[in-house]
């Protein structure tokens, strides 16, 4: 068997064994995707025992490409809501992430001085304890530049391997302990997150209002500012027995009934000006009007504003709601359409059919993945991650790397949605498949590389001590920040888990946190909110420690 075929076979074996281990449950808690790392360690140990030669270049490529796939799909998933989340809670989350990095650095410094651990070893243990491979690379580079002996620099990888497993398990353990200590109900936390940060808060309400203000009599709809705002849509007007879709030029009369859509606060403002809320049905049943939901798939309308389509004037059809990535938005005239947007329409059946043709409504397109934007995004991400950032006094340039670059680009592209005929929408099933494939490949290779000397160092060397140091570097910051965030900041548990995973730049921990609730995106959103800054600080921190302690 060729080296390439053998390498692929070993990776498949690692994935099967690791996923099986990940399904084991102890008191309802399992390693999940993190089990792949231990599958890799087991297979790696026996591969070295039986002197199996694997293709090193291929393993390196698979490890990096798997990580790129994982972080890119995470960015595409959370991109639409990332920047709004950053404005709402990003400062608080990133402050906790900074605190975690600082506490981890202090614990590392104390262990280094208290137990006289060689600087290269403690930096390797530190990188493994915080599960950050780019930090290991940065530490190796700066120590080499500072003149550290090559044999000590090479031992950093073993320190990393010793600390990495507990770095993976430790964060899962802390999440579990916080859940037990605070007696947290995950379903309740998910509902609370939805109500305060997204779905339920953004769910639109309706109100039927009777026109009682005589000052409005004789005015057209476009002459009433509140009825033309970006916060409220008037989708139906009832006059006597006639139900119609109001156009911008429709004249308002006293006694008219208006069906309004918007958030409660905005609806109340309109009610105060227009008249009073009434319990009158403005249903389309038994009328010439009907309602329908259509999806935007036509590339020709992507990026266009609802005003520019002029659907009301052309087809006598009103867009009452716009659902984007599970969040309902007011279909204001200034709203731009993105691929996958779901529109609620009101109008005559033939008019709705015409509007459906305009926006696309091709359901099968939602199951297709445009591969060109995927590789454009990955390529741009790799380029961004490769840009060096030179800081005076640091001999090694800082980089976002292959993990940070694709994530940042994916967040931006996910927020933009589309450029011309290119759209970055990805069906949830395809996104999940690529994400899981990426993290399995990454952890399989990390486990294989660590497994060879793992047992020998653990049993005959200083492996146990290194594991202990790593456990402290992992556990103390996580417990400190986790308890503070829950007790003082009253942080949502799922948001907290995502923040902890992002602060540790730990994809397996995010996979575990995502698995705590099947539908909530809270963990992924907070992970992406803190990840870019945390990655930068994780890359900088071992370099700062190396510079500080090299001369001491």
Swiss-Prot record:
A GO CC term attached to the entry: plasma membrane
PROSITE patterns cross-referenced by the UniProt entry: RCK_C
Record InterPro entries: AAE_transporter, RCK_C, RCK_C_sf, Transpt_YidE_put, YidE_YbjL
GO terms for MF: monoatomic cation transmembrane transporter activity
Localization (cell): Cell membrane
Pfam entry (one): TrkA_C
Main location: membrane
Domain named RCK C-terminal: residues: 192-276, 279-361
UniProt entry keywords in alphabetical sequence: Cell membrane, Membrane, Repeat, Transmembrane, Transmembrane helix, Transport
Any one biological process term the GO annotation gives: potassium ion transport
HAMAP family noted in UniProt: YidE
Protein name (database record): Putative transport protein YE4162
